């Protein structure tokens, strides 16, 4: 699996791995790259079955497989220890990495994640699946911003959203791959295993997230032994895109604090 690695800003700089959500594209993290690359070696990637890592995914594709293939790619690149920043599905992959490779994952940042899919989130995905079946890729792509962004943010950026729609349609991961990745997301359940995650965790959520209720992050915070929760008052599901200034400050402070906390505990 292809990875994109930034040059380390100094010798032995900590590594931060960015894992996007269901869309799978590493470019999702563009608003974070410039600030992160000043302090960390940053790893981005298109998830298997998407972008520049095309593949046909098995029907039983799982979050555990997503975590294993990423860890193997990191080891092949010579990376033994890394912090993980995961958004939604990416946060699930991050938790799986922390469970399966505890010696490797130094810190986990969960952005609008959950222990197991909430009934409201499941309802949203049911609507989106019906759109996919009835209207194809175009209907899926056109509806997606409604679940990602606040209404006023979208209204002020209509030309940008039209361009993003065209790009997303041109690089659509395919109906079968999308549904298999979505099914992996829906099957994931960390409610009985989260207390085994020992790395420090920062939980970031947005209070106006239409797709994932903030209660999901509260449940995560209660279940994870060493966690802190930060709530952004605005930003929607893709809060790192819509309010990068606020998000980046939380992310940078969280990474620095948790990495220091971990080193002090060793």
Swiss-Prot record:
Hydrolase recorded as keyword: yes
Annotated GO MF terms: hydrolase activity, acting on carbon-nitrogen (but not peptide) bonds, in linear amides
UniProt key word Hydrolase: yes
EC number(s) reported in the record: 3.5.1.-
Organism superkingdom: Bacteria
Transmembrane feature ranges: none
Pfam families: Abhydrolase_1
Catalysed transformations (reactions): carbamate + 2 H(+) = NH4(+) + CO2
HAMAP family assigned: RutD
Family membership noted in the UniProt record: Belongs to the AB hydrolase superfamily. Hydrolase RutD family.
Name under which the protein is recorded: Putative carbamate hydrolase RutD
Organism: Escherichia coli (strain SE11)
